[in-house]
UniProtKB/Swiss-Prot annotation:
Entry-annotated residues carrying Phosphoserine: S444
Composition bias, Pro residues: 625-636, 670-680
Domain named F-BAR: residues: 12-282
Tree of life domain: Eukaryota
Entry GO MF terms: lipid binding
Organism of provenance: Homo sapiens
Gene: FCHSD1
A GO CC term assigned to this protein in UniProt: protein-containing complex
InterPro entries registered for this protein in UniProt: AH/BAR_dom_sf, F_BAR, FCH_dom, FCHSD_SH3_1, SH3-like_dom_sf, SH3_domain
Subcellular location: Cytoplasm; Perikaryon; Cell projection; Cytoplasmic vesicle
Chain intervals for the UniProt region annotation (Disordered): 422-444, 609-690
Annotated protein name in UniProt: F-BAR and double SH3 domains protein 1
Primary role: Promotes actin polymerization mediated by SNX9 and WASL.
Keywords noted in UniProt: Cell projection, Coiled coil, Cytoplasm, Cytoplasmic vesicle, Lipid-binding, Phosphoprotein, Repeat, SH3 domain
Length: 690
């Protein structure tokens, strides 16, 4: 009689399977590295003997054809693989035998391409990613083993307590209390043992529930590893190999076609074979050969001892098991909403970084690539967490818990936030806001979202029209500065907007005195540069209301007489029109700081165009008094407050929404929004803002 098979721990079995996978993968990569090295060696020797004819080429191709890996019959059975393409090229070399002097340089360049070191670097990178994913799976299996061990211990303690309680009860029923115990003491002992048995039963129930939850989570993780992560990693390795093998093989084929007319048929066949190489088919055949990359059987629940319960139990009213499972549902639904937001935000950050990488210099490329890897790793962790959480929630729902009660609000809130970000993205893209600052803020938001699972709530700002900076602006509402970096403005004043603010609804501007600060954007009116506005000038000695234009001082100037203006560098000067038939003597007339005078025109730069004759101005025309902007400050929120309970649309299904292309940059506001004006200003009776 043969002994029963030895029992192997689940963690040890999974670990051995992973080690075997790594070993076979390294062997496969080594064969491909040898093939790449063969191609480089072939090109180097071909460049040296290209000037010779006939037998030299045959002697060159002979050693490569005699290699064990290339002369075996597996080349024909594997079909359209890189090995078959390589064999076809060698046959074309043997059949040809003609040389071309101009092909020598091309072979020499091909020999200096990427070699074994680059292939080993690709293998090392892919192996690290695979080992990281395998370590996470092993951790899940170890957690399952620990919970199963605890479950077995609790079951043994509970069974022992049951036996003791049953023994005392039997003695009590037989009145067999002996000489050392009375009936009263036996009754007390029976009561005590019954209480202990009930307590151990609750502990057994909690341990069994934890075991079941870890069981479904581990199975889901294993399935995700074999269905998603492992094929993705292997596909990445194959794509890297294709970049190193496709170009050399294609170059060899083209060189043969151009070098000799007599071997045109053989060279053309080699080119077709190379272009028809199916990397997906090669990968599929490789996965079918070893047999170790097939998914492992799912883990099954193994009851301990005499316990035959294999489902979640959440007990009656008042039992600790009920509150524990409900808390578990709340935690899992919150985690599901967080994973959903992390994945959507992560894909948006990936798109931004990909655009930035295409335009980045060689010095910035490594840092951007590192950021891309970090974001991809965060998205992958969120996907794994989502798969495990979905399995747990499905089991909890099957046990009778109302999962929809917490899941729908959580997912609805997450989708609302994603929709808000999509609208913000459309507003940003309409302004072509693709600056590195916006991308850095996007990445910072993603990192904070990954750590806390919370996104800052802010109202979607109104999309602003694209305008070139700096540009002039007319103040239509007064504003008193509330911070040191803000600027106090008065109604009717002209400003120069020099840059966007550090938050929405704020811009940085410079007044006529050269002072710079942040002002509310909705308190300003940006005139059309092609249609200059007209304004009143109370200091005009002629009594007419000329059309006002702006000019910015390029240099500071001190007036040489009482008629001349003095102004600092950067000041905004309002130009007054000259006579229609006047001669430009190099001095313009303008107003600055409440004074009217002349100044050299070479010291300023026009902002609104040349001043026109007096007949073009309308004395009755003035800037209209606009109505207050439709704005209501957002309700105060705190980043410490968690997001409201999300909602999942749909019926009773527990599937999560797909990841949409909602690419929306979000800039975290650094200052509160400006207060709204109470009403439109009255030119005759100005009131302060409230």
């Amino acid at each position: 009689m043969q002994p029963p098979p030895r029992k192997v721990k689940p963690a040890q079995e999974v670990k051995l399977r992973f080690l075997e996978q790594l070993s076979i993968l390294q062997t496969w990569q080594q064969r491909e590295a040898d093939l790449l090295e063969d191609i480089r060696s072939y090109s180097k020797q071909r460049a040296a003997i290209e000037r010779e004819y006939g037998q030299a080429l045959q002697k060159l191709a002979g050693p490569f054809l005699k290699r064990e890996g290339h002369r075996s019959g597996e080349m024909d059975s594997r079909g359209r693989t890189v090995f078959g393409a390589w064999r076809c090229l060698l046959d074309a070399t043997v059949a040809g035998g003609q040389t071309r002097l101009q092909a020598s340089d091309r072979y020499r360049d091909l020999a200096g391409g990427t070699g074994r070191s680059a292939k080993e670097q690709v293998l090392r990178k892919g192996t690290e990613n695979l080992q990281r994913a395998q370590a996470e799976v092993l951790q899940s299996v170890r957690e399952l083993s620990r919970s199963r061990k605890l479950y077995g211990q609790r079951e043994r303690v509970w069974a022992l307590a049951q036996e003791k309680a049953a023994d005392v009860q039997a003695r009590l029923n037989r009145s067999d209390h002996g000489i050392f115990h009375s009936r009263t003491s036996l009754q007390k002992l029976s009561t005590k043992l019954s209480a202990q048995s009930a307590q151990y039963s609750q502990q057994l129930q909690a341990a069994r529930n934890e075991y079941l939850l870890n069981l479904v989570a581990t199975n889901a993780h294993l399935d995700h590893y074999y269905q998603e992560e492992l094929p993705a990693l292997l596909k990445a390795l194959v794509s890297e190999l294709s970049e190193h093998l496709r170009d050399p093989l294609t170059s060899l084929s083209h060189t043969e076609l151009e070098a000799a007319e007599v071997i045109l048929e053989h060279a053309h066949r080699g080119e077709q074979t190379t272009s028809q190489v199916s990397w997906e088919q090669d990968l599929k055949l490789f996965l079918q050969e070893p047999g170790v990359f097939s998914p492992t059987p799912p883990q099954q629940f193994q009851p301990a001892g005499t316990d035959q319960v294999c489902v979640l139990e959440w007990g009656a009213e008042g039992v600790a098991g009920k509150s524990g499972l409900e808390k578990e549902v709340q935690r899992l639904t919150s985690r599901a909403a967080r994973d959903y937001k992390i994945q959507n935000h992560g894909h948006r950050v990936l798109q931004r970084l990909e655009q930035r990488r295409q335009q980045a210099s060689e010095r910035e490329a490594p840092s951007i690539e590192q950021r891309l890897q970090e974001v991809r790793e965060s998205i992958r962790r969120a996907q794994v967490s989502q798969v495990k959480g979905a399995a747990r929630l499905a089991l909890l729902q099957g046990a009778g818990l109302d999962v929809e009660r917490w899941l729908k609000p959580a997912m609805t809130q997450a989708q609302d936030e994603v929709e808000q970000e999509r609208r913000l993205s459309e507003a940003r893209l309409s302004q072509r806001d693709l600056s590195p600052t916006a991308e850095d803020a996007e990445l910072s938001d993603f990192e904070e979202c990954e750590e806390t699972g919370e996104l800052f709530e802010e109202p979607a700002p109104q999309a602003l029209a694209t305008r070139a900076l700096p540009c002039p602006a007319h103040v239509v509402f007064r504003y008193q500065a509330g911070r040191e970096d803000e600027l106090t403005i008065t109604e009717g004043e002209w400003l120069e907007v020099i840059e966007e603010g550090d938050a929405d609804e704020w811009v940085k501007a410079r007044n006529q005195h050269g002072e710079v600060g942040f002002v509310p954007e909705r308190y300003l009116n940006f005139p059309d540069l092609s249609l200059p506005e007209s304004s009143q000038d109370s200091d005009n000695p002629c009594g007419a209301e000329p059309t006002a234009f702006l000019a910015q001082a390029l240099y500071s100037y001190t007036g040489q007489s009482a008629e001349e203006l003095s102004f600092p560098e950067g000041a905004l000067i309002r130009l007054l029109p000259r006579a229609q038939d006047g001669v430009d003597d190099g001095f313009w007339r303008g107003e600055f700081g409440g004074r009217v005078g002349v100044f050299p025109s070479l010291l300023v730069e026009e902002l609104l165009g040349p001043p026109g004759p007096p007949e073009l101005s309308d004395p009755e025309q003035m800037l209209p008094s606009p109505s207050p902007p439709s704005f209501s400050p957002p309700a105060p929120t705190s980043v410490l407050d968690g997001p409201p309970a999300p909602v999942l649309p749909g019926d009773k299904a527990l599937d999560f929404p797909g990841f949409l292309d909602m690419m929306a940059p979000r800039l975290r506001p650094m200052r509160p929004p400006p207060p709204p004006p109470a009403k439109a200003p009255d030119p005759g009776h100005p009131d302060p803002l409230t």
